[in-house]
Structures are given as structure tokens and as C-alpha cells.
């Protein structure tokens, strides 16, 4: 009887602990909105994965062995002014703010026509036509180089890319890129290999468009990939490699310093 009493007491104590334990740890939502390393996808052409689909025109997405020799990566290829994007269509970030991180390598940037404009990331939402392009750039003929810049289109501030000569776009080199979309002041910040790029920052009243305020839509979609907008570019085709995508309500890190 004493043994049964002790056993019953132990069971009651365990049950009490379970009932009174704070649910905070299990109830706290994960900061991660989406991840994709491509390691679990089959080699070859791909049109969708976990939490993402695709948007292509004169372009393809292909899972290939990683150039590092470990795992797999995504090869993005377009012809002319085609496009090929991984699309996260159900984003819904809390507070309309989020971080993104990815590794990417662009084999070659355009050298013609003058002012050729390209996009690597584009965020949008259903309540506004405004497209937010946190990662893109432009060929600047006066400098004979491509430069990164944050941009936008279709909204009150017009079509603009705020490229900066302090952010040259280097072809054939892997970079770890992060960007943060902060709805508090419609701020976009960019980091290369863990280093902030303050010259690329744009916000409500500091951007490259008209005098109107730059205002985010309510984000529900993010596209990552490549699009060049002008016809007849040189070179005539483009190859981009992308890997280790992470979208989160917090900075993911993993890019070095």
C-alpha cells in the first residue's frame, strides 16, 4: 500500500507539473517564415518546392549539384529579357516586416543596353500596386559598370532604382545577401556578407522616386530570382546560382561578420 501511495503521489505531481507548466515555449510562433536549401529536391528542372512555386518566362529553374561540392543549389537561367523566380506566395509576415537571407552568384551582368535594369528580389501585396525591389541594380554607362540598388515600381513614387557606386555588382562571385523590410518607416536595409550597406537604405521620405512617400503594400508575396527588363541585352542569356534561402521575422545571420 505504501508503494501504491508513493506511486500515486508521483503521478499526481507529474500531472500537476504538466498542467501548470507555462505554454509559452510551445505556443511561441517560430520566427522562420520559409526556408529552402534545395538539398531535398531531385536534380533537374523544378517548378515548386516546400512553401514556394515559380514564375518563369523565357527562363528555367534547375536543381544542380552545389558548386561547393556539398549538397545542391538552384540554377536560374534566362534568355534575353526573360525572367525566372522562386515565388513565396503566402508570406504574411507579422507587422508587415521581415528579413531575408540567401547566397547567390550572378555569372554576368548586362553591358548593354545603356541603363539596363535587373531585379533579384521583389515583394508585393494585394492592397497596392507598389512593387518593392530590395535587391536589384542597373548598368550605368557613364561608369561602365553595374551597381546594386533598392527600387520600386507601379506605386506613387514611380519607377526607380536607387543604385549607388559604393555597391558595385561583382560577377562570378558568391555573396551572402540579407535584406530587411521594416514597415515602421517603410525602410529597406541591405547587407552583403554580413556587412551593412547604409548607402542602399531607402525609407518613407528617402528614396529614388518622386516626392511622394514610399509606402509598403501589405506583403503576401516575395519573388527571388532574375529578371532583366530591356530587350536585346548583352550578353543575351543570364545564369544565376542561388542557395540557402531563409525568410524570418528576425535576422537569420550566417553571412559572416
Cite the ranges covered by each PLM segment.
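Glycan-recognition/cleft segments
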Residues: 116-153
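Flexible glycan-contacting loops in extracellular carbohydrate-active proteins
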Residues: 201-240
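Localized edge beta-strand/strand-to-loop motifs within extracellular or lumenal beta-rich domains
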Residues: 173-189
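Secreted extracellular polysaccharide-interacting domains
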Residues: 73-101, 158-164
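Secretory targeting and sorting signals
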Residues: 1-28
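Extracellular glycan-recognition surfaces and repeat-rich motifs
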Residues: 42-75
Amino acid at each position: 500500500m505504501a508503494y501504491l501511495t508513493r506511486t500515486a503521489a508521483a503521478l499526481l505531481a507529474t500531472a500537476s507539473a504538466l498542467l501548470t507548466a507555462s505554454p509559452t515555449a510551445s505556443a511561441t510562433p517560430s520566427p522562420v517564415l520559409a526556408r529552402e536549401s534545395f538539398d531535398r529536391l531531385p536534380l533537374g528542372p523544378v517548378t515548386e518546392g516546400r512553401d514556394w512555386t515559380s514564375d518563369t518566362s523565357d527562363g528555367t529553374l534547375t536543381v544542380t549539384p552545389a558548386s561547393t561540392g556539398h549538397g545542391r543549389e538552384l540554377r536560374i537561367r534566362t534568355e534575353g529579357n526573360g525572367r525566372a523566380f522562386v515565388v513565396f506566395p503566402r508570406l504574411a509576415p507579422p507587422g508587415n516586416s521581415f528579413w531575408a537571407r540567401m547566397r547567390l552568384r550572378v555569372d554576368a551582368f548586362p553591358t548593354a543596353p545603356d541603363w539596363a535594369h535587373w531585379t533579384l528580389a521583389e515583394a508585393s501585396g494585394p492592397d497596392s500596386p507598389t512593387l518593392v525591389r530590395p535587391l536589384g541594380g542597373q548598368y550605368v554607362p557613364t561608369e561602365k559598370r553595374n551597381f546594386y540598388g533598392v527600387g520600386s515600381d507601379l506605386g506613387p513614387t514611380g519607377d526607380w532604382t536607387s543604385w549607388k557606386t559604393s555597391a558595385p555588382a561583382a560577377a562570378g562571385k558568391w555573396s551572402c545577401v540579407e535584406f530587411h523590410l521594416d514597415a515602421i518607416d517603410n525602410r529597406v536595409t541591405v547587407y552583403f556578407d554580413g556587412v551593412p550597406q547604409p548607402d542602399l537604405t531607402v525609407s518613407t521620405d528617402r528614396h529614388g522616386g518622386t516626392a511622394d512617400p514610399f509606402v509598403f503594400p501589405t506583403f503576401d508575396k516575395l519573388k527571388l530570382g532574375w529578371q532583366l527588363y530591356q530587350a536585346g541585352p548583352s550578353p543575351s542569356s543570364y545564369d544565376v546560382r542561388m542557395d540557402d534561402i531563409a525568410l524570418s521575422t528576425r535576422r537569420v545571420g550566417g553571412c559572416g561578420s
